[in-house]
Every structure is written in structure tokens, then in C-alpha cells.
């Protein structure tokens, strides 16, 4: 029998115990702030605390966090998440929460913060683009309004009934943003073989005094592109009213009955573009031309609603263009599926030929493997794994959002480089000043970063935690052990290594020191 609410009830009880200080067995210090918590909860939610307590569980009652990286409000928010499973940013900057989560190796929170920063950057970019489009459209309306008086003299004659049928599928007269006499519509490439379309387009071009795009300049199917009647306010304001054309007098009545449903409005599109001179030789549209947005055409709309309003001679072209479009989409999706797979196979082949996973597997004790959850690399000790994890969250790998104009951005006073938070700025300033704030109490040697000091401390303690499995020699640094193995035991390691499937580690063999020594002397 299962109790679905058991986990929620357990977290609630642990949260109450933390607030009461009951059974709290550790204290986390962030600057001057103190946080009482339970080691089991911290180690379960953070890889940093897991590696911190792994070797010396009983000797580490107090945990000091770097206040330059982790702020007290950000850690309080992450601590609430550990006990309640809810993340509420409130008024905290996302950059501070991202820096704290990266330092504590809380990967789920890092992904959420990066996603929010990316959405924020996308929103700001979209708003900026809309403002630019609105300004460019208003300028185009002013330039196009100067020639609107010539429209009345260029009205098509009664013999252009085929061209009027094509225009009858347009949802509204306001959706056509075209310069007078320069309006052209994209026709299917197969339309060159249809005499009706070509014969009716030429008289209209002669009467208007301009060149209408012939079928050879079309690149998309007319039936595949119907007019989108739902537009942004900026797009609606920048289009021209073509009501001066007498041949379009019946369009409004047709639109009221045809576009009565909002679903049909959103599903149908036709693309109408503006250019000064359209000819068979021109295939590119300049960046200043106004391009109307279009969305994906639904199958149900194209099958049930749009077909009955198309001209009869365009029906076979519509079916052919739909089939060609579906084939192109299938090929594109196949290419997208093939590319990551091929890249992954190359990566797997490189990992199989690498010696590091096998050496790391042999170096660690039987049954203990310290694997990076992000890149699947293996390390001989939790300390080296912790140092490696910090490389995944370097400054250049983070996603940076464009800060608002009224926000004080951390900026270097010497080189003018900007940063997302104060920690990265302080770390960068050390490159200019040469400051080394971390000093060894034994010899007085200084270091720029705390992990370098921790690595140096082993020199004074004379500890040699890294042992060779075959000759019983011990080393202070893991790099010395790797060089020793490559120099003396490389052939033996290759003979013992068994390649497994891609991205999987080789099985650990139980070799005693006596067996390995005999193997060396053979």
C-alpha cells in the first residue's frame, strides 16, 4: 500500500524542525548570517554538500560559504527550496540565485535560472524589434501615400476577371501593404504552364503601367500562402487602404461571410510584398521592404474552408505545392535527427579511445566511482570532482541577459568590461591588481583562488591520498599518480581495460596487490 502524501508530509515535518532548531546537526555561515539545517537534507539536494561531508562527516559541523559568490538572501531562498520544493524568486536578482546554485552545484536550479534569463533576453529583443518595425512601417506609409492619387487612373478593365478572382481570397483591404501600381503576388512555379494565369496578368500589368511578377519569379504556392487577418496593431497601422479600386467592391461582402471564425482567420495566409520594380530577374527582396508575417497553415482549414474560395485553375497547383512542402519538412526533420546522432557517435568513439576513464576507474577503491553528472568524466577523489564541477559554471559559459538601462551593471573601472554579478567583477579585478587574498598559514604563500590553497595545503600535511594499485607507491597530487601510471604501468592498464558500450564505464576487476605485482614482473 502506497501513501502518496508521505513525501510531502515528511518535507513539511523537516521544515518545521529546521525552523524550531530541532535535530539540526550543522550550521551554514554566509558572511554574518547563520542557517541551521540537517546534513542529510543538504547532502541530498546539493552536490557541494554531498562531497563536503563524504570524507569527514563528524568533523564538519560548521560550513563556511564564500560570501562573494553566495549571498545570504540567495542561500535562504535555496534552503527554502530544499525543504519545501518551491522556488520563489520574489525580488531577488536571478543572477544572484544562479551564482549561488552554481556554487552549490544544484543543477535543476541552474537550468531554471538560465531559462528565465533567456526568456527575459528574448522578450526584450522582441519589444525592441516591434518598436523598430512600427517606426519603419510609419515611414513607409508616408512614402506610399504620395502616389495614392495615381491609383484611380490605373484601375483594371472588365476583362481582368481572373485577376479579380485571385484578389477575392484576400481577407481585408487593409491587409495589403503595397505601393500603387507595384502590387504583385507570389504564384506557384508550375503556373508557367497555365495560359489563364499568364494571359490575365499581362493586361493588368499594362494597364497599371508597371510589371506584375510573372510565374517565373514566384517561389511559393498561392494556396500555401493565404492572408493572415489577425495582425498586430503596428502592422495594421502601416498598411494602405485600397478601397479606391472599383474591382474590389465585393471583397468586403465576401470577407464578412468567409472569415467569420477566428480559427479560420488564424489558419489562412497569403503573402503580399512591395517592391519598386518586379521582374523575372529579381528574386531577392531588400531588407527595407515590408515583409508580412505568416503562420503555419492547418490541414483542416486548407482542406475544408480554403479550397472552395480558390480559383478552379489553382486547385491542382495547391495539391502539388502541399505535397512538395510536406516532403521538404520531412527531409528537414530527418536532417535534424541525423546531425546530433552523428556528432554523438564521434564523441562516443573519442571516449572509447581515451585512457582516462579506465585509469580513473582503476585508481578509485572497489565500488567507488566519482562521475561528473554533466559530462560523464570520472575522477579518483571527490575533491577533484568538486574542482571539475566548478569549471562548468565559469563566467564565459553562463547565459547573460541584456540589463535594463536603469539598472547599475557591475563594470570594471579599468577595462570597462561588464559582468552579471559582483562576484565575477571582483574575480576579474584580481587579474588587474594581482591580488592573492588566500594565504597559507604554514608558509605564507598566497593564492588567487581558494581551491588552489586547498591543493597547496597537502604539501604541509604530508598526506599522500593517491596510491598506485600495482606498486604501492603513494602520491600527494593526482597528476603525479597519472604520470607515474603512464610511465610505468601504461601497457598493463591497456591490457586490463575492457571497452564497453558507448558512454558506459568498464567493469571494475577485483585485483589484489599480490596478483598485480606478479603481473608486473612477468
From Swiss-Prot:
The cross-link Glycyl lysine isopeptide (Lys-Gly) (interchain with G-Cter in SUMO2) sits at 273
A single MF term (Gene Ontology)? sequence-specific DNA binding
Question: Which SMART domains would you find in this protein's record?
Answer: BTB, ZnF_C2H2
Phosphoprotein as a keyword? Answer: yes
Zn finger (C2H2-type) start-end? 370-392, 410-432, 438-460, 466-489
Please list where the region (Interaction with DNMT3A) is annotated. 310-427
**Keyword presence, Metal-binding:** yes
Q: Which UniProt keywords apply?
A: Developmental protein, DNA-binding, Isopeptide bond, Metal-binding, Nucleus, Phosphoprotein, Repeat, Repressor, Transcription, Transcription regulation, Ubl conjugation, Zinc, Zinc-finger
* Residues the record lists as Phosphoserine modifications: 157, 516-517
**Chain segments carrying region Disordered:** 121-166
**For the BTB domain, which residue ranges apply?**
24-91
Compositional bias, Basic and acidic residues, is annotated for: 121-143
Entry's Gene3D superfamilies?
Answer: Classic Zinc Finger, Potassium Channel Kv1.1, Chain A
CDD domains attached to this UniProt entry: BTB_POZ_ZBTB18_RP58
Q: Supply the InterPro entries for this chain.
A: BTB/POZ_dom, SKP1/BTB/POZ_sf, Znf_C2H2_sf, Znf_C2H2_type
Which cellular compartments is it found in?
Nucleus
Which GO terms are recorded in the biological process aspect for this UniProt protein?
A: cerebellum development; cerebral cortex development; hippocampus development; homeostasis of number of cells; in utero embryonic development; negative regulation of DNA-templated transcription; negative regulation of transcription by RNA polymerase II; neuron development
Q: Name one GO cellular component term.
A: heterochromatin
User: What biological function has been recorded for the protein in this entry?
Assistant: Transcriptional repressor that plays a role in various developmental processes such as myogenesis and brain development. Specifically binds the consensus DNA sequence 5'-[AC]ACATCTG[GT][AC]-3' which contains the E box core, and acts by recruiting chromatin remodeling multiprotein complexes. Plays a key role in myogenesis by directly repressing the expression of ID2 and ID3, 2 inhibitors of skeletal myogenesis. Also involved in controlling cell division of progenitor cells and regulating the survival of postmitotic cortical neurons.
Q: Which family does it belong to?
A: Belongs to the krueppel C2H2-type zinc-finger protein family. ZBTB18 subfamily.
Cross-referenced PANTHER family: ZINC FINGER AND BTB DOMAIN-CONTAINING PROTEIN 18, ZINC FINGER PROTEIN
How is this protein organized at the quaternary level? Interacts with DNMT3A.
Question: What protein am I looking at?
Answer: Zinc finger and BTB domain-containing protein 18
Q: Which organism is it from?
A: Rattus norvegicus
- Organismal lineage: Eukaryota, Metazoa, Chordata, Craniata, Vertebrata
Amino acid at each position: 500500500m502506497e501513501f502518496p502524501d508521505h513525501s510531502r508530509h515528511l518535507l513539511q515535518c523537516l521544515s518545521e524542525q529546521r525552523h524550531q532548531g530541532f535535530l539540526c546537526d550543522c550550521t551554514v555561515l554566509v558572511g554574518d548570517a547563520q542557517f541551521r539545517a540537517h546534513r542529510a537534507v543538504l547532502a541530498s539536494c546539493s552536490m557541494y554538500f554531498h562531497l563536503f561531508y563524504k570524507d569527514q562527516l563528524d568533523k564538519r559541523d560548521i560550513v563556511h560559504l564564500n560570501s562573494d559568490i553566495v549571498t545570504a538572501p540567495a542561500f535562504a531562498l535555496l534552503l527554502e527550496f530544499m525543504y519545501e520544493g518551491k522556488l520563489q524568486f520574489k525580488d531577488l536578482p536571478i543572477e544572484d540565485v544562479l551564482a549561488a546554485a552554481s556554487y552549490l552545484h544544484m543543477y535543476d536550479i541552474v537550468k531554471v535560472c538560465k531559462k528565465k534569463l533567456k526568456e527575459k533576453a528574448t522578450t526584450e529583443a522582441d519589444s525592441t524589434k516591434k518598436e523598430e518595425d512600427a517606426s519603419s512601417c510609419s515611414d513607409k506609409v508616408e512614402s506610399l501615400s504620395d502616389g495614392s492619387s495615381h491609383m484611380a487612373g490605373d484601375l483594371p478593365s472588365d476583362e481582368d476577371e481572373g485577376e479579380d478572382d485571385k484578389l477575392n481570397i484576400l481577407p481585408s483591404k487593409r491587409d495589403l501593404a503595397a505601393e500603387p501600381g507595384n502590387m504583385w503576388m507570389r504564384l506557384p512555379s508550375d503556373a508557367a504552364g497555365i495560359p489563364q494565369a499568364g494571359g490575365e496578368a499581362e493586361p493588368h500589368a499594362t494597364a497599371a503601367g508597371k510589371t506584375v511578377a510573372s510565374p517565373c519569379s514566384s517561389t511559393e504556392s498561392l494556396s500555401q500562402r493565404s492572408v493572415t487577418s489577425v495582425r498586430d496593431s503596428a502592422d495594421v497601422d502601416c498598411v494602405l487602404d485600397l478601397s479606391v479600386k472599383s474591382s474590389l467592391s465585393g471583397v468586403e461582402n465576401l470577407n464578412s461571410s468567409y472569415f467569420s471564425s477566428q480559427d479560420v482567420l488564424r489558419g489562412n495566409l497569403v503573402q503580399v510584398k512591395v517592391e519598386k520594380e518586379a521582374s523575372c530577374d529579381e528574386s531577392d527582396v531588400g531588407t527595407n521592404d515590408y515583409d508580412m508575417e505568416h503562420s503555419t497553415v492547418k490541414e483542416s482549414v486548407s482542406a475544408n474552408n480554403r479550397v472552395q474560395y480558390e480559383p478552379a485553375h489553382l486547385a491542382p497547383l495547391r495539391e502539388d505545392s502541399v505535397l512538395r512542402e510536406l516532403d521538404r519538412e520531412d527531409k528537414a526533420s530527418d536532417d535534424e535527427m541525423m546531425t546530433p546522432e552523428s556528432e554523438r557517435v564521434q564523441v562516443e568513439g573519442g571516449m572509447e579511445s581515451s585512457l582516462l576513464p579506465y585509469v580513473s576507474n582503476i585508481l578509485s577503491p572497489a565500488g567507488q566511482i566519482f562521475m561528473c553528472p554533466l559530462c560523464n568524466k570520472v575522477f579518483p577523489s571527490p575533491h577533484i570532482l568538486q574542482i571539475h564541477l566548478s569549471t562548468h559554471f565559469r563566467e564565459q559559459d553562463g547565459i547573460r541577459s541584456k540589463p535594463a538601462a536603469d539598472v547599475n551593471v557591475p563594470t570594471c573601472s579599468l577595462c570597462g568590461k561588464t559582468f552579471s554579478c559582483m562576484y565575477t567583477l571582483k574575480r576579474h579585478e584580481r587579474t588587474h591588481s594581482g591580488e592573492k587574498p588566500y594565504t597559507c598559514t604554514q608558509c605564507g604563500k598566497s593564492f588567487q583562488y581558494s581551491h588552489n590553497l586547498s591543493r597547496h595545503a597537502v604539501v604541509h600535511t604530508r598526506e599522500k591520498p593517491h596510491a598506485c594499485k600495482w606498486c604501492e607507491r603513494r602520491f600527494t597530487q593526482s597528476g603525479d599518480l597519472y604520470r607515474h601510471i603512464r610511465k610505468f604501468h601504461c601497457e598493463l592498464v591497456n591490457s586490463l581495460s575492457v571497452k564497453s558500450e558507448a558512454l558506459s564505464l568498464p567493469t571494475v576487476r577485483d585485483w589484489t596487490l599480490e596478483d598485480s605485482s606478479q603481473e608486473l614482473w612477468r
